[in-house]
């Protein structure tokens, strides 16, 4: 009788396992990295003629952190307002592990904190709002940016 009860218990136990989902990846983004990159590129094109205005957050005029804050809001991500606070939150990411949507930070010596922020796209490219005006896509390996890079933060899962 004990073997019979044990056998039924094992059958129920094993049958319960068959109902587990194939993947337990709860943090899978709702769109791929390529789609994220394309959406970022498309959204940033709307900012190509935006003048650089310290404290601004719209396409009528914005600074670098206003640009990242407003652009990332299109992805449902609410960023802190300033470059300094954007750099202090999120998840720290190494340069080798950058993904589309990660924020990249630089010590430029300009502005109240001397910091600058952009959004990583792919293949070492990032988009930022230039102090000369308008969104620009540039390479992290450019001598100017490479020497000023200070870190990255991830806000997208």
Where are these regions (language model features)?
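C-terminal motif of bacterial Sec signal peptides marking the signal peptidase cleavage site
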Residues: 13-16
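Catalytic cysteine-centered active-site loop
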Residues: 27, 31, 51-100
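Aromatic- and glycine-rich peptidoglycan recognition patches
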Residues: 19-37, 42, 77, 92-93, ...
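Positively charged n-region of N-terminal signal peptides that target proteins for export
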Residues: 1-4
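Structural motif
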Residues: 101-102, 124
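Extracytoplasmic/secreted envelope proteins and their assembly/folding machinery
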Residues: 37, 41, 45, 65-69, ...
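N-terminal capping segment at the start of a domain
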Residues: 42-54
């Amino acid at each position: 009788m004990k073997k019979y009860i044990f056998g039924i218990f094992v059958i129920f136990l094993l049958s319960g396992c068959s109902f587990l989902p194939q993947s337990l990846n709860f943090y899978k983004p709702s769109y791929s990295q390529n789609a994220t990159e394309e959406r970022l590129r498309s959204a940033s094109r709307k900012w190509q003629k935006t003048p650089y205005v310290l404290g601004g957050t719209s396409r009528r005029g914005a600074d670098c952190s206003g640009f990242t804050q407003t652009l990332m809001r299109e992805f449902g991500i609410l960023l802190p307002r300033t470059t300094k606070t954007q750099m202090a939150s999120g998840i720290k990411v190494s340069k080798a592990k950058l993904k589309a949507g990660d924020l990249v930070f630089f010590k430029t010596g300009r502005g109240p904190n001397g910091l600058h922020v952009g959004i990583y796209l792919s293949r070492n490219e990032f988009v930022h709002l230039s102090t000369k005006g308008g969104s620009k896509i540039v390479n992290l390996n450019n001598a100017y940016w490479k020497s000023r890079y200070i870190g990255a933060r991830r806000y997208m899962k």
